[in-house]
Amino acid sequence: MNISKVLILETLYELLLNGQTNRVSLVRLQADVNDHPMTKQLAHQWQTLKINDILDVIKLLFPKQTSLSDGQIIFYNLQIVEIRDTLLDVVRECQDTLVKDVKQLEQQYQAIKSHDDMKIRRERIMGMYRDTILAKLQSFQHFHRLYSKLDPSPVVRDMMDLERIKATSIENLSHLQHILQKCVTDSVMTTKAGSDRYREIILSQGELDDTVKFVRYAMDN
């Protein structure tokens, strides 16, 4: 709306100033407004102003100082300098609005950027915890053999192996613990009870529990 005011006032000011008269053809005013260079620059987001749109703006800005006659708008008791001053006021109003809009957009951008930065830092930290836990588990006697490579089995769906775990983005420590616990559970499901591998699986559960406790302690301190 403010941009419309600027275009109409500027065009009106030039027509009255050049014509040295107190009346302006509405058709001429509409044509000049829609041919204004600023209108052409905003063509992709701008609707052509109709005569009624222009009249609404003029009546709003100069109530009780205009009348219509034979397709012309006539101004009463209105000095050309008043139109210029009104134009400058509207321009300042536009500038203030744009400044506020820009500041609001900057605040929104900073909020999004801060959120994204925090998300990236969190993902990086969680990745460090994941790699630390995997490295520690690989140093143990039993667990690393458990999840280094699991053979496919119809008993277990969506089996995990070491490379897949390394590539997983974890949300938190509990998420990683759930993934690693699934390795133990999958192995239990695919291993004969009482076998040597089964005993290794039981021992690996203790290794996993100790590692998770260690990392949780490190996070808290």
UniProtKB/Swiss-Prot annotation:
Keywords: Chromatin regulator, DNA damage, DNA repair, Nucleus, Transcription, Transcription regulation
Coiled coil: none
Main location (coarse class): nucleus
InterPro entries recorded: EAF5
Keyword Acetylation: no
Domain of life of the native organism: Eukaryota
Record-level GO BP terms: chromatin organization; DNA repair
Keyword Transit peptide found: no
Compartments it resides in: Nucleus
One CC-aspect GO term: nucleus
Signal peptide positions on this chain: none
Protein family (similarity comment): Belongs to the EAF5 family.
Protein purpose: Component of the NuA4 histone acetyltransferase complex which is involved in transcriptional activation of selected genes principally by acetylation of nucleosomal histone H4 and H2A. The NuA4 complex is also involved in DNA repair.
Quaternary data: Component of the NuA4 histone acetyltransferase complex.
Protein name, UniProt field: Chromatin modification-related protein EAF5
Organism annotation: Eremothecium gossypii (strain ATCC 10895 / CBS 109.51 / FGSC 9923 / NRRL Y-1056) (Yeast)
